[in-house]
């Protein structure tokens, strides 16, 4: 079934590996409009899937990035879902059994990053970010290189947007407007 979803309608992107010989290449994407909507999968067997995945990722950054920065500047929070399940549960996700997943939330504000797992990180202490799609783990580091928070890249929905926002916040320290 074909359905058109405009880029601005995509709220969550999940990138992962599929197939036996993918090594560290994230070759598959799933996306959804919101938490109550179904996931749509782009598998590597679709012609030009790699280009389509990059376009969707980049369009999310272009559309949601400025919105998220404005929300943060207005003293709001931007939420990201993440998975803390075992690999067997993640396999349910990969097979399309999305109802079996237990999503948790990260809440990012201009001042803090808070997680459902009880992590509380003051943004002013974050001086570096490491990781990304070529790395297994995203780490927020203090000025001495000590990890303040980490999350597996493949467990964080819209991980590229999260990374872009943190990088921007490190470089620009968002002033709060009221």
What are the residue ranges of the model-derived segments?
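Residues located in well-ordered beta-strands
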Residues: 9, 14, 125-127
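Short acidic, Gly/Pro-enriched loop/turn segments at secondary-structure junctions
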Residues: 3, 14-28, 130-143
